[in-house]
């Protein structure tokens, strides 16, 4: 009889086989399972019931449940012709989990998992087994307190799998980066040169300010911060400040966006509309000399031209004979061209002269209407404030 029993055991279920069965009894430290096609019942110790820590088998199974497990050992008593299959449900769950996670890693897919524990180095998550999100892979942003994730279900990607060492490394940061890139691409496609949009000052450099316009940073060069001359960006804006910007150019391949705050603001000329009138006598400061005349600032950022013929009653060869930058002068407004933002001025009209000569109307008209290259333009009018606008 014993010989027949041993021979039947050879042909029966053996170690390493995968079996199924019905839970017959749930005890304190183990579960008894009726194995389909088996000669004996199976026993699953509590340590082999789940990939997670449990205090009681009843937390994961109940009588009547269908379970699947690996046979880790076959025990039998030859004398009494009885035996049992020692089973591991945990081993099978781990195998399935690694297979699932490997597929997600190969396909670069996102999964969802619940944070079961917050530890010093990161987050412990449930991915069918214990998975770990290191602190460096939690977010693209700095997060001071990781406890905000405790109990939350988060979206993550598989970063590294090492079944031999039971190591599962995951990344929430990779998901955030992917989502940010998608938003960035969508935003870049929606923007057009000339658009005026809202933004927030993200950081400042010597050469300008970077503005966050919804997930993408654009640069406002220092020359595009204001109509007035700016030495450093801090003179005009501060980090976190909400601003309106105009898109000057977009390079979608390099994701470089040039912006302007200045173009969203009234020009200095617009600010003085109604303040000055033709024939007004006002004070100004000589800011620049040219062969054809002198540029005089009559309001912040607004310069008018005193043609060389309007500088003095006597004939002069160059403006530098009687004027120098920084000199305060009295001027009379000869004409205002609001459309082209030009002001024609005269110094000699404010000076006494025994042989007063009327200002030559043709000179004023020539300046206000001139479009020739050698004649002053709006760039001449506000001088070096508009130089070097390239980003």
UniProtKB/Swiss-Prot annotation:
GO molecular function: mRNA binding; structural constituent of ribosome
Keywords assigned by UniProt, alphabetized: Repeat, Ribonucleoprotein, Ribosomal protein, RNA-binding
Domain S1 motif: 16-90, 108-173, 194-262, 279-348
Record's GO cellular component terms: cytosolic small ribosomal subunit
Alphabetized InterPro entries for the sequence: NA-bd_OB-fold, Ribos_protein_bS1-like, Ribosomal_protein_S1-like, S1_domain
Source organism superkingdom: Bacteria
Coiled-coil annotated spans: none
Protein's GO biological process: translation
Pfam family, one: S1
Region spans: Disordered: 356-381
NCBIfam families in alphabetical order: PRK06676.1
Family named by the database record: Belongs to the bacterial ribosomal protein bS1 family.
Known role: Binds mRNA; thus facilitating recognition of the initiation point. It is needed to translate mRNA with a short Shine-Dalgarno (SD) purine-rich sequence.
Name the UniProt record assigns to this protein: Small ribosomal subunit protein bS1
Native organism: Staphylococcus aureus (strain MRSA252)
Name of the gene encoding the protein in the UniProt record: rpsA
């Amino acid at each position: 009889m014993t010989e027949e029993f041993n021979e039947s055991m050879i042909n029966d279920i053996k170690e390493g086989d995968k079996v199924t069965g019905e839970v017959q009894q749930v005890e304190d430290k183990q579960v008894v399972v009726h194995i389909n096609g088996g000669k004996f019942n199976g026993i699953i110790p509590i340590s082999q019931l789940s990939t997670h820590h449990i205090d009681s088998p009843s937390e994961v199974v109940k009588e009547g449940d269908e379970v699947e497990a690996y046979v880790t050992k076959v025990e039998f008593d030859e004398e009494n012709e009885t035996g049992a299959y020692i089973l591991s449900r945990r081993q099978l769950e781990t195998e399935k989990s690694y297979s699932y996670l490997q597929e997600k890693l190969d396909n670069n897919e996102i999964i969802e998992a619940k944070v079961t524990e917050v530890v010093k180095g990161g987050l412990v998550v449930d991915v069918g087994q214990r998975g770990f999100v290191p602190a460096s892979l939690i977010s693209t942003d700095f997060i001071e307190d990781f406890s905000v994730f405790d109990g939350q279900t988060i979206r993550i990607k598989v970063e590294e799998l090492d079944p031999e060492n039971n190591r599962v490394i995951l990344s929430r940061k990779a998901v955030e980066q992917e989502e940010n890139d998608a938003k960035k691409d969508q935003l870049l496609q929606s923007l057009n040169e000339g658009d005026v949009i809202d933004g927030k000052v993200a950081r400042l450099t010597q050469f300008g300010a970077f503005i966050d316009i919804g997930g993408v940073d654009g640069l406002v060069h220092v020359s595009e911060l204001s109509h007035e001359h700016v030495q450093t960006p801090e003179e005009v804006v501060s980090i976190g400040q909400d601003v309106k910007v105009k898109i000057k150019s977009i390079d979608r391949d390099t994701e470089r966006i040039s912006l302007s705050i200045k173009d969203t603001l009234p020009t200095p000329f617009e600010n003085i509309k109604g303040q000055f009138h033709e024939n007004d006598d006002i004070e100004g400061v000589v800011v620049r000399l040219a062969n054809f005349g002198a540029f005089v600032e009559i309001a912040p950022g607004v310069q008018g031209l005193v043609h060389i013929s309007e500088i003095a009653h006597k004939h002069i060869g160059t403006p530098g004979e009687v004027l120098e930058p920084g000199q305060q002068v009295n001027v009379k407004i000869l004409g205002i061209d609001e459309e082209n933002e030009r002001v024609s001025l005269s110094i000699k009209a404010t000076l006494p002269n025994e042989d007063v000569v009327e200002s030559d109307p043709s000179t004023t008209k020539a300046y206000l209407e001139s479009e020739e290259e050698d004649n002053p333009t709006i760039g001449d009018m506000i001088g070096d404030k508009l130089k070097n606008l390239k980003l």
